Amino acid sequence: IIVVLEKPKKLPKRPNFSCGPCVKRPGWSLDNLKSFEVLGRSHRSQICLNYLNDVIKLTKETLDIPEDFKVAIVPGSNTGAFEMALWSMIGPLPVDALAWETFGSGWVNDIKNQLKINDLRIHKADYGNIPDLSLIGDDTDICFTWNGTTSGVKVPNANWISRKRKGITFCDATSAIYSQKLDWEKLDVTTFSW
């Protein structure tokens, strides 16, 4: 079902759209940084390690990530994180890959054409729709985007992911992480940018 809405009469103060959380908050400035002493320093320096550890701790607390889950900060934003996970973990089992917008389609392309996973089932839907989630297997790895930034379509919840699954769930949660409740117990690898 496609719903056509009226064009809004009220525009945002900053009407430039970009996918993901790219824009700084109103009033943000470099002057808000606690310290410039970390600029140009190695991430291995003690001061930078302290900042990184603080950010990781706050991220877990803010998002209610279970205590036994690991959080890491990696280069390359969400794309870097998702690619690292795919390239190092996907493949021994069959793969169910879902796509209904730009980012999910990109992950499907990588799995099919770069990683060349042979036992791949692609669940694709047109923009504005979502694939039939009841077709996802219990004995497969699952690759999906929780909320399709470019299409505005999201999975309703994680009920379609079996608690008895044998595979790994790879979830691109960039546009969902701070706005929707995620079922962490069903998400093995969850990536996002901020």
Please give the residue ranges for each predicted region.
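Conserved PLP-enzyme active-site core in the AAT-like
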Residues: 81-194
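Sequence-level motif detector for i,i+2 pairs with an aromatic at +2
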Residues: 12-14, 69, 139
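Generic recognition of cysteine residues
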Residues: 19-22, 48, 143, 171
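Structural signal for conserved beta-strand scaffold positions within catalytic alpha/beta enzyme cores
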Residues: 18, 73, 191-192
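Short, conserved catalytic or adaptor-binding loops enriched in Gly and charged residues
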Residues: 8, 62-65, 115
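Conserved N-terminal alpha-helix of the aminotransferase class I/II PLP-enzyme fold
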Residues: 32-84, 88, 100-110
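A broad, low-specificity signal for short, low-complexity segments enriched in glycine/proline
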Residues: 31-34, 55-59, 131, 165-171
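N-terminal "arm"/small-domain region of PLP-dependent enzymes with the aminotransferase-like
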Residues: 1-46
